[in-house]
Amino acid sequence: LAPCAVGPLVREVTARRYRQALSAARQLGIRRLVIHSGYIPLVYFPEWFTEQSVAFWREFLPEVPEDMVLALENVMDETPQLMTDIVRQVDDPRLGLCLDVGHANTCASRTPPMEWIAPMAPYLRHVHLHNNLGDWDLHSSLGEGSIPMQQVLTVLLEQCPASTWTIENQDCAPSLAWLAQQGYLSEE
């Protein structure tokens, strides 16, 4: 799905699938949806991506209930700049951001994970937590990788206390144990 697609038919299919997701979310009582930004380096010119994404979201958001938030997630984004520009220009409380900390630490990103937080903080609604070694999107447990996870979580708690978090691991037990060992969770 690509809100910034060059082809109008792809944008139409994207809007249709998002409508279906909204409908399912309403039925399930879900009020926060995470959507990939759609940016692919070397495919989209950054200016085009931003311009087309802003136009798409301005047209689509009136269909989103006032109590629902769509959060754009970084996947192949090189920096937080394009996503923050889109949300700032759209200027609608129903559109926010999702920081995928692991994606910010892959070969696609030119910006270290800690440097994604401050620019995204005013718009950050959700966070995906997993670790890796700085190259591939391994979805390793929080304590296994090169991301300074304790520092990341401390800054997230300070700058984005209302954001929700998802642990994105095949097996969450090691990450839950790490969170408890670091004092983020009680060991019940």
Q: What do the predicted segments below correspond to?
A:
Residues 3-96:
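Active-site acidic/histidine proton-transfer and metal-coordination neighborhood
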Residues 20-26, 31, 80-188:
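Histidine-acidic metal/acid-base catalytic patches
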Residues 1-2, 40-42, 131-136:
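Conserved radical SAM core fold
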